C-alpha cells in the first residue's frame, strides 16, 4: 500500500514501467519475460492472439478476423472451466476456434495427438481446483506432445499462488492473477518465452487495446 501511495503522485513512462515489471516477473516465474495486463481473462485473449499473429502487425490489426492464420486452439474437455465466464469464451474473443478433446473426467494422449492439426495455433492447459481433479494429461506430457508438433502451450494458472515450476514443465506462456497472488488491484500477469510475450504485448495495437494495464 505504501509503495502504491508513494508512486501515484508521479508521472511514469509506461514502457519503462513494463520493462521493470518484465524483469520482476521473469525473476518470480523463471520465464524469459513478462508484462502486466488488465486481468487473467484478458491475458488468455491476448496470449491466444499472440500465438496466431506473432509480431505481424497487419495480422494483429485484423483480429478477430483470422483469415489466412492458424486459428485453432485445443483444450481438454476437463479443463473447460467457468471462472465467472467460460474459458472457451475468452479464447473465442481473439477470433480463434476452440477444439475440445477428451471427456470430462478422462483424456488420453492419443486424443490430444488427434486434435492437433495443420490449423492448430496453440494449446491451453488449466491448473485450477475448478478443473477435473483426475484423468487429465499431465502438463509435462501435454507439453511434450504439443512441442513435438510445434504447438505452443498456454498455461492458465490464475488459481495458483506459486509461480514456479511451470516453465520447467513445458509452458510457453503463463497466466497468473495478480490480485490472488499479491493481494493487489485486479490485474493479470503474462509470462513466458520472450518472442511470445512480445507478441502478446503487441496486441495492444489491436484487440488487446482495451485490456492493457
Where are the predicted features?
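Conserved PLP-enzyme active-site core in the AAT-like
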Residues: 1, 22-25, 30-36, 41-213
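A glycine-/small-polar-enriched, mobile loop at the entrance of the PLP active site in fold-type I
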Residues: 1-22
Amino acid at each position: 500500500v505504501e509503495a502504491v501511495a508513494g508512486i501515484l503522485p508521479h508521472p511514469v513512462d509506461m514502457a519503462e514501467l513494463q520493462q521493470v515489471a518484465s524483469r520482476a516477473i521473469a525473476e518470480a516465474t523463471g520465464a524469459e519475460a513478462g508484462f502486466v495486463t488488465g486481468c487473467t481473462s484478458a491475458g488468455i485473449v491476448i496470449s491466444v492472439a499472440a500465438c496466431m499473429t506473432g509480431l505481424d502487425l497487419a495480422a494483429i490489426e485484423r483480429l478477430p478476423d483470422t483469415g489466412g492464420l492458424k486459428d485453432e486452439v485445443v483444450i481438454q474437455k476437463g479443463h473447460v472451466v467457468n471462472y465467472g465466464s467460460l474459458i472457451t469464451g475468452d479464447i473465442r474473443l481473439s477470433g480463434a476456434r476452440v477444439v475440445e478433446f477428451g471427456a470430462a473426467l478422462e483424456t488420453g494422449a492419443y486424443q490430444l495427438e488427434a486434435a492437433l492439426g495443420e490449423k492448430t495455433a496453440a494449446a491451453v492447459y488449466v491448473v485450477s481446483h475448478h478443473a477435473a481433479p483426475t484423468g487429465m494429461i499431465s502438463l509435462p506430457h501435454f507439453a511434450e506432445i504439443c512441442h513435438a508438433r510445434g504447438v505452443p502451450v498456454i498455461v492458465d494458472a490464475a488459481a495458483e499462488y506459486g509461480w514456479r515450476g511451470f516453465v520447467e514443465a513445458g509452458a510457453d506462456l503463463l497466466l497468473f492473477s495478480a490480485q490472488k497472488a499479491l493481494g493487489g488491484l485486479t490485474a493479470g500477469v503474462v509470462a513466458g518465452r520472450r518472442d511470445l510475450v512480445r507478441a502478446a504485448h503487441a496486441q495492444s495495437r489491436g484487440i488487446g487495446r482495451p485490456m492493457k494495464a
